Amino acid sequence: MSRNHRRPSRRDQAEFTRNTARYVNKRFNVSNPFERVLILLVIAVVVGVMVGVVLPKISSEVGELTGEYAASGPAADVLETLRVDDDQSGDGYDRDLFGYRETDDDGDGCDVRDEVLARDLEDVTFTTPGGCQVQSGVLHDLYTGKTIDFVRGPQTSSAVQIEHVVALENAWQSGARDWDTAKRYKFGNDMYNLLAADGEANSEKGSASAAYWLPTNADFRCEYVARQIGVKDKYDLSVTTQEKRAMLAVLHTCPAQEIPAE
């Protein structure tokens, strides 16, 4: 038989705390200073546990009431069309299933990493005249706001990494696990979902969605979230409830934000 559970109210918390204090007073000799401290610690732990249970719910409700999770504008409109799926699984994920850097969709013989570097860096030089391989350049990093001098080499190339705006593992969880190889390879090498970025920021993000990671450069957050929405719309990928709320909270600050063009 199923049972309905409700979250404890503040009155419940207060009553529970009082009852706990009475029990501890009976159990221990409160004339002892050490045991007084112990009583306070026990009560603090109990209250802390109950607050931990209640606060997430309160925070979510406050967000709804204050309009934090309400946004309007072109990007927000597209977000509202995305499927919401909280039953996501990373089982079976393997980065190699997306064939990153294994295709040449435009047939120019250039590696997609070098194509992104050539697009996103300034003052670009190549290892050979007329070639594809980027030797050096300057990145004005959108994630951090830093300016990074890129120089190709075993010890220096990692300063600038190629970032999947919608991470491959997040895509897998959001629907890519059901794709065929051709579609996964297309996604893994789609320039629309690729960005040259600070290596440390890319590593810090990992496979996190907008619910758990946003660029430290606040000026880029609206465009970043809009890009993720654009990618997910293009490939019919879902979002989780938390992810959607995080996106709406960002877009709430920029109602004119559009989906970036390809």
Regions found by a protein language model. Give the residues of each.
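N-terminal Lys/Arg-rich, disordered targeting/topogenic segments
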Residues: M1-F34
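A charge-rich, low-complexity, intrinsically flexible signal that marks solvent-exposed coils, linkers
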Residues: S2, V30, F34-L38, D87, ...
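Hydrophobic membrane-insertion alpha-helices, especially the h-region
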Residues: R36-P56
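Ser/Thr/Pro/Gly-rich low-complexity linker/stalk segments immediately outside membranes or between
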Residues: P56-V78
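An N-terminal structural lobe/cap that precedes and organizes the functional/catalytic core
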Residues: D85-D94, G99, D111-V116, T147-P154, ...
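N-terminal post-signal-peptidase region of extra-cytosolic proteins
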Residues: F98-T103, V112-S136, W179-K183
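Acidic, glycine-anchored loop motifs typical of Ca2+
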Residues: G107-G109
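Domain-level detector of nuclease and nuclease-like folds
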Residues: V134, Y143-E262
